[in-house]
């Protein structure tokens, strides 16, 4: 999948799940499952419930995403 095909949207982490998975409530009200991108994992950036994040969604499956940025 090319980088151009992704949908970027902001949301808030509502719950942490095993294996670095998170439930994220998006700005449009939808709740999705998201995993952490490799760069965030590599730099040991902690993500906790209540954090504002940017999520990349695939146009093919809008229920799963990848967390690419955590706002300070």
Curated annotation (Swiss-Prot):
GO MF, any single term: ribosome binding
One cellular component (GO) term of this entry: cytosol
Domain of life from the UniProt record: Bacteria
Record InterPro entries: NA-bd_OB-fold, RNA-binding_domain_S1_IF1, S1_domain, TIF_IF1
SMART domains named in the record: S1 (SM00316)
Keywords of this entry: Cytoplasm, Initiation factor, Protein biosynthesis, RNA-binding, rRNA-binding
Principal place of residence: cytoplasm
Transmembrane segments: none
Residue ranges constituting the S1-like domain according to the UniProt record: 1-72
Subcellular location: Cytoplasm
Pfam families named among the record's database cross-references: eIF-1a
Subunit structure: Component of the 30S ribosomal translation pre-initiation complex which assembles on the 30S ribosome in the order IF-2 and IF-3, IF-1 and N-formylmethionyl-tRNA(fMet); mRNA recruitment can occur at any time during PIC assembly.
Its biological purpose: One of the essential components for the initiation of protein synthesis. Stabilizes the binding of IF-2 and IF-3 on the 30S subunit to which N-formylmethionyl-tRNA(fMet) subsequently binds. Helps modulate mRNA selection, yielding the 30S pre-initiation complex (PIC). Upon addition of the 50S ribosomal subunit IF-1, IF-2 and IF-3 are released leaving the mature 70S translation initiation complex.
Family: Belongs to the IF-1 family.
Protein name according to UniProt: Translation initiation factor IF-1
Gene: infA
